[in-house]
C-alpha cells in the first residue's frame, strides 16, 4: 500500500466540509501541486467545493455539464486505461452525478461515501456499472 494516501483515510463525510470531491481536490493539491479543481468550484458556483445547502447542490448540474467542464482540463479515458490520479465520476440511473472517486492502483480507488469515512475500495463490478466517465487531468505526466 502506498503510504502517501494514509493521511486521506478516515475523514468523516460532511457536505459542508469534507465530501467526495473535496477529498480529490485535497489529494490533487497536496500530491500534484494542482489547483485544477478551483475551476470546477467556480463553474459550479460552489466556493471551495463546500456547499452551504448540503446535498441539494448536486441537483445543480448533470453528468453532461460536469463533462463539459472536465473536457476543458482533462482527457476522457477508458476503464481499461486507468492510471493513478484518474477521476471517476459515478452516476445514478438518471445520469445525475452522485459520487466521485480517485483511482490509485491495482483496481483500487479512494473515495468518501455519503455518511461514511474516506477509505480505499476495490473497483468491483457493482462500482463499474455506475461509472459515468473517467478523466485524466491534462497536467499529469504520463
Q: Where on the chain are the PLM-derived regions?
A:
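A glycine-biased structural micro-motif
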Residues: 5-15
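Active-site nucleophilic cysteine motif
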Residues: 13-32
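General N-terminal targeting signals
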Residues: 25, 30, 99, 105-107, ...
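Short acidic alpha-helical/loop segments enriched in Asp/Glu that coordinate divalent cations
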Residues: 35-45
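Acidic, low-complexity intrinsically disordered regions
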Residues: 37, 53, 65, 123, ...
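...with weaker cross-activation on analogous glycine-rich loops/strands in unrelated enzymes
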Residues: 44-117
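Short, Lys/Arg-rich amphipathic alpha-helical interaction segments
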Residues: 108, 113-142
Amino acid at each position: 500500500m502506498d503510504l502517501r494516501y494514509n493521511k486521506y483515510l478516515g475523514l468523516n463525510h460532511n457536505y459542508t466540509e469534507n465530501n467526495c470531491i473535496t477529498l480529490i481536490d485535497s489529494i490533487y493539491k497536496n500530491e500534484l501541486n494542482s489547483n485544477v479543481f478551483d475551476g470546477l468550484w467556480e463553474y459550479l458556483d460552489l466556493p471551495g467545493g463546500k456547499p452551504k445547502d448540503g446535498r441539494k447542490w448536486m441537483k445543480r448540474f448533470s453528468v453532461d455539464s460536469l463533462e463539459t467542464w472536465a473536457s476543458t482540463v482533462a482527457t476522457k479515458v477508458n476503464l481499461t486505461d486507468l492510471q493513478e490520479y484518474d477521476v471517476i465520476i459515478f452516476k445514478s440511473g438518471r445520469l445525475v452525478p452522485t459520487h466521485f472517486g480517485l483511482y490509485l492502483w491495482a483496481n483500487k480507488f479512494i473515495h468518501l461515501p455519503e455518511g461514511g469515512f474516506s477509505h480505499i475500495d476495490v473497483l468491483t463490478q457493482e462500482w463499474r456499472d455506475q461509472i459515468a466517465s473517467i478523466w485524466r487531468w491534462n497536467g499529469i505526466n504520463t
